[in-house]
């Protein structure tokens, strides 16, 4: 004691800690795509659906009075299919850790299970929005999503993990590269309308820039979707693309300007656009979106096919701990390959 006649806090022993009884988790937990798309229960790992198209418009559909009715051409429906994917998280907590009292939580096991539940939902969001190709040891026995691009086969390995075809794979893409959709190629044209709904951005207004897209690319995609008969009303973007959409409010030619009259607010955000055809799109920023793609879609056209909903299962106890598993099995279905659009940013585009 520096001063034996004055007892200060530094001289105290056995002081009670001042510890906040809460835990701050800053990690983002929002999952827009998983939250906005519907769910449907299934009872098989492989699920299928059918698509069809009308015959081309016949501008010469005129016939002589009293003529014989000739047979017309008819085509069968097209079968599409995808598979479910198993997502899993495991928690193991010692009996001692699960018994001790802690600040900010009750039992350690329950806290860790809650965290893993949120993590598996984020994993699902990231996977479904990727370019992941369908992978299945039986993929060669079922019709696939593109006649020019069969699904990846798991080398006939019975232990290969199934992977559900994700967003880009279920759109009319232009091929695969290393087990994911090739981002350097346009997709095939719709046989019915000629629309191309998976495209690489040209970024024509910035020909010396090797990445990005511009207004012309955006409205070209909305035109392609209109031509295909799509009812897309959402544009989902990575946060890095928000500035490009905000730039639609003005242009360098001076023919379009933002007006800040009688206001002290500076608003740079663009949260919806209406294209020259009168189609309105809501812009949704999603941190789990690929940085090299922009998606145009209607949420009702996408469905999570759930074989097993997320479930907590206690595993066998063979030591002084508790071990639990959270597991789910789900796949993705797209109503029609041409119902949604993918605009790949012009990565690697050679300057003109």
Curated annotation (Swiss-Prot):
Query: Which keywords appear in this protein's UniProt record, sorted alphabetically?
Result: Capsid protein, Late protein, Virion
**Keyword ATP-binding appears in the UniProt entry:** no
Q: Which GO terms describe its cellular component?
A: viral capsid
Q: What is its main location?
A: virion
The entry's localization annotation reads: Virion
Q: Which domain of life is it from?
A: Viruses
InterPro entries according to UniProt: SU10_MCP
Tell me, in a sentence or two, what this protein's role is: Assembles to form a prolate capsid of about 145 nm x 44 nm.
Name this polypeptide is given: Major capsid protein
Please name the source species. Answer: Escherichia phage Phieco32
